[in-house]
Amino acid sequence: MGRGKVVLQRIENKISRQVTFAKRRNGLLKKAYELSILCDAEVALVLFSHAGRLYQFSSSSNMLKTLERYQRYIYASQDAAAPTSDEMQNNYQEYVNLKAHVEILQQSQRNLLGEDLAPLATNELEQLESQVVRTLKQIRSRKTQVLLDELCDLKRKEQMLQDANRVLKRKLDEIDVEAAPPQPPWNGNCSNGHGGGGGVFSSEPPQPEHFFQALGLHAVDVNQPPAPPPGGYPPEWMA
C-alpha cells in the first residue's frame, strides 16, 4: 500500500525540530547551489533559524549586489503598476461622468413610465410627451411590419397548400381513369332478321299506343279501308 498523505505541521519536540531543520537546511542550500551551476542562474538564499541564526548562499561573489538588483526590479515593477496622479484624476472624472449619465437615463426611464413627473416643468413635460409620441409611432410601425411579415408568410403557406391540393387532385383523377371499366365499341349499322341491308339506328324508343291516344289519334290498320268522312264521299268531279 502507498504511503498516506503527510500533514505538515510544527514539530513540537525541540530536539526533533532542530534535527529536521539542519537536514532540510543543508538540502535547501545544496539545491540552490545545484540550480546556480546547472542552469547558470543567479541565486541568493537567506535563511533564519528559529533562534535567529542567519544562513545564506549566493551564487555571485557578493550577496549585496544580488539584493540591490532585486530591489531595483521590485521598485521598477511597482512604479510601472502604480498609476500616476494624472491618470487617477482622469479615471475619477470618467467615473463621475458615467455615473451622471446613468442617473439621467434612469430618471428618463422613470419619466417614460409616468413616474416622478411632479418636478418637471411645462417645457420638460412637452418634450416628454413628444418623446412618448415618437416612441408610440415607432412601436406601431414595428407592429405593422411584423403583422405584414406574418401575413406574407401565411399567404405563402396557403399557396403551397393549394399547389399540393392540385397535385393530389390530379393524381386522384388519373387513378379514377385507370380504374374505370373499358366501354364496348358501338356499331352504327343495325341488321334485320333476314341479315339484309342496314338501316339507321334511332336512339328514340318506340312510342306505345296510348301515346297516340293521348294526342287524339288512333292506331290505323293498313289492311282496313279508310272510313268515309262524316259528310259522305265527295262528288266524282272533285275526286
UniProtKB/Swiss-Prot annotation:
The segment annotated Disordered runs over: 179-208
Instruction: List the keywords (alphabetical).
Output: DNA-binding, Nucleus, Transcription, Transcription regulation
- UniProt-recorded Gene Ontology molecular function terms: DNA-binding transcription factor activity, RNA polymerase II-specific; protein dimerization activity; RNA polymerase II cis-regulatory region sequence-specific DNA binding
**Record flagged with keyword Transport:** no
Which one GO biological process term can you cite for this protein?
A: regulation of transcription by RNA polymerase II
Q: InterPro entries under this entry?
A: MADS-box/MEF2_TF, MEF2-like_N, TF_Kbox, TF_MADSbox, TF_MADSbox_sf
Give all residue intervals belonging to the K-box domain. 88-178
UniProt domain MADS-box: residue ranges: 1-61
Q: Where in the cell is it found?
A: Nucleus
Query: Pfam families from the xrefs?
Result: K-box, SRF-TF
Is Transmembrane one of the keywords?
A: no
An annotated GO cellular component: nucleus
Describe, from its UniProt entry, the tissues in which this protein is expressed: Highly expressed in leaves and at low levels in roots and spikelets (rice flower).
List all disulphide bridges recorded for this chain.
Answer: none
Role: Probable transcription factor.
Q: What is this protein called?
A: MADS-box transcription factor 34
Q: Which organism is it from?
A: Oryza sativa subsp. japonica (Rice)
